[in-house]
Amino acid sequence: MARYLTVLGTQSHVGKSILVTALCRILKRRGYRVAPFKAQNMSNNSWITADGSEIGIAQAIQAFAAGAEPRAEMNPVLLKPKGNMTSQVVVLGKPLGDRVVGQYYESIESMMAIALNALYKLSEDYDVIVVEGAGGAAEINLYDRDIANIPLARAIHSPVLLVGDIERGGVFASLYGTIALLPPGDRELVKGLIINKFCGDPSLLGSGVGELEKLTGVPVMGIVPYSGLRIPSEDSVSLGDKKPEGLLDVDIAVVRFPLISNFTDFEALERIARVRYVSLDDSLGRPDIVILPGSKNTVSDLKMLKNSPLASEICSLASDGVPVIGICGGYQMLGRQVVDSGIEGGMPETIDGLGLLPVTTVFDRYEKCTCQSTKTVTGAGPLLAGIRGSAVTGYEIHMGQTRTDSPAFGDDGCVSDSGTILGTYLHGIFNNASFTDAVLKYACERKGLRYVRPEGVRDPYDELADIVESAIDLDAIIRLIESQDKV
């Protein structure tokens, strides 16, 4: 049975997910059997496990870092926002249905029970479970409905590391204030503080660290530098973060829909070329590649796209031979029509797509396809001809059925007669080197450039683990873990 370590934050986006990823790899390298856990995750970015369960992609990434197979128990409750205070609720990897906030909170006790049962089941197979919290640890307006932070740590008697983000300023106040807002009995769970995303010389923090330790009675166990590593991220807020300089002079424009989902599809590209996310009220400019990503609500985002200048820009670029690629909801939007019986938009309606691919998508039942897939490249044209017959892998998470007579990947997707407009339901397709090479090679050739595949880089999980391990008091953290009785 397992011991626990819980990582909570002073607020959202302080770096909890990436620190849990690092800790999973660090503990794995120390010989522990490790798994991640997040009771409740709110994200439109998800991963499909081997058995077809849907979990937050952050937990899948953390599992990979731990050398573990992603499982539904690692993220028992996934909330996928759809707008209008409504989220699709995914429980143990399967969609339960759409719920408004009030409806969801009515079932919060049962959700806590589900989360604890999943954690205990996971604990049977691992030595250490690294638990990630959600949002801020001391949201006092939600404390009685919180299943992911201090109430969970209290239930499992787990030591807590509290993380603050110095990059955004006010880290001492946020760490002190978070502890001060916790009920006295719960403050004792916080055993260590982590100052994250520090740039510069740690000695510049001066007496601040000592004063913080004196005020809180909790030791600072790490001052972690900003790394800039491209580990897949969870929240769309990270799309505005700093990006490293691209290796290729290829400009890739990704349409940033209001309800964008699975934007991690493009993080493999970000390590190779210049990727920018373009909002609907901006202009695409003259990119070398245009990508329409997945959407949590195709109907809503398609309507907004068509009412924006980007719709005509996409069509114009496509007619000029610029590669246009749609993934999942983006694929559906590239077609002739989207026929909705009320599943997506609430009312039956038919919406014209961009008309760039000869497909029609029909939403006629509340049924989601979730599976891992391996497809054979069957499409023709300049993007696919060079890799025709090869295999590509990915995963599908979508509602609606799309039919075509010009499939790109066996029974999936569609490719235009020109061969430069492509749609697919495969998330993660850019993780296939052969496909990515083919697309980038064509984009380079159009610019008169020679495409040279970037040389391999070191495993980013080990690189991240090295950075974090050198910046934390790992011995103290391991003592926290080992001091617990096994559950």
Curated annotation (Swiss-Prot):
The active site is at residues 328, 427. One of its GO terms (biological process) is cobalamin biosynthetic process. Keywords: Cobalamin biosynthesis, Glutamine amidotransferase. It comes from the Archaea. PANTHER family: COBYRIC ACID SYNTHASE (PTHR21343:SF1), DETHIOBIOTIN SYNTHETASE (PTHR21343). Catalyzes amidations at positions B, D, E, and G on adenosylcobyrinic A,C-diamide. NH(2) groups are provided by glutamine, and one molecule of ATP is hydrogenolyzed for each amidation. This is Probable cobyric acid synthase. It comes from Methanocella arvoryzae (strain DSM 22066 / NBRC 105507 / MRE50).
